[in-house]
């Protein structure tokens, strides 16, 4: 009998050595005392946890003796945290405070369609933007959207365009945080002005056809509203480095301060992008920045400030090539055309799809600068001393908007945004006599190879062309590389 007692004692010893306990309690609203059903309670550093029931109670079983930290969280409330020493069953109650004005949920001043509106629309989430957009222009993520076609055109950074139901960008209202971005003169949208907006995009809604927009914008084709990231409740940041063909290099850095003194929060993103381009001469040299700030004046009264911009310059590829030069698919398509010149097929059938006529080499002895009208300067160094771009785009058009959200009562809310968008920049092109290098005489598209620019020839001709009708000694240029400059400022207030 004595031996049996010893065996039983040894058998049950682990139960006493590893006693299991229960932590229980309630999760309630700190101001009203109401139960917070569904609140999560977690033992930090373990897989143990529980969800609060309808009456706000929770229970976590099989907790070994020891010291632990418990956290409780639920959407719309600030997280709670408590420490507890467990040597038996313990009770831990949480009283959570409402999050200060839900700073992480930016209310956008924009006309967005909902489930019950008779508008065809598609929403693109931030997760989709991060997974599918990469370093492309914003419109490219909409290519899988019904009735939408987007293309990068010649491949230059920011040179994309979008068509909705057959209408081009002049008939599509493009907005950032509810602020219209179409050109005031011709309605076009220059995506190079927003080259880095994809890195700060929270969501995109594409409305197809006439929609709920109550602004004077050209929206017969549709409405595209880009929503940027709000200020974040939690402190943190991220760093991203991207590499690609054509010497592509893109660096992105982001930082959020989190909520400071339950009153304010700041977020900032900066992007640097460079590369020689996939197409010949389609280099890019760009920066992008995004800044957000939010301040809680009082309950139901909030101010937000946002600024976004993308100072950039890039080479363009704007000339169409003979269809047979577009690789195997181009040759196949050309052969299917009854009126296509077969002689051209023989000349262009082995064309280099990466060829671009918007640039050409120039002698290193040429020291001319490029005309430039940005940041108070009139001239700037060329991107590369070994070549000249006929077509180059440069611009910086920041957007700054101040949002005010005011809850008048339970049935009325007032949203007001004051904004400014402006800047300067332009693009290059040629005037006067052309200096080209066709392989043989003939039409430029039917030479044995596409023509190229002869910049050295143009410089020589301009340097030895005394025109006595204008001046007895000075040379008169036969052809010039011009820069067209655009300066604009747009102010506005939207309230509803």
Regions found by a protein language model. Give the residues of each.
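Short, acidic, small-residue-rich periplasmic hinge/interaction motif at the N-terminus
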Residues: 28, 32, 39-44, 73-77, ...
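Short, acidic Ser/Thr/Gly-rich low-complexity loop/linker segments typical of extracellular
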Residues: 46-57
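Short acidic/polar hinge/loop motifs at secondary-structure boundaries
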Residues: 61-62, 131, 161, 180-208, ...
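Structural signature of outer-membrane beta-barrel domains
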Residues: 113-115, 169, 181, 229, ...
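Extracytoplasmic beta-strand/coil segments of soluble accessory domains associated
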Residues: 139-180, 202
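A beta-strand signature from Gram-negative outer-membrane beta-barrel systems
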Residues: 195-240
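Transmembrane beta-barrel wall of Gram-negative outer-membrane proteins
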Residues: 236, 243-274, 279-317, 324-362, ...
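Acidic/polar loop-and-plug regions of large Gram-negative outer-membrane beta-barrel proteins
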Residues: 302-401, 428-486
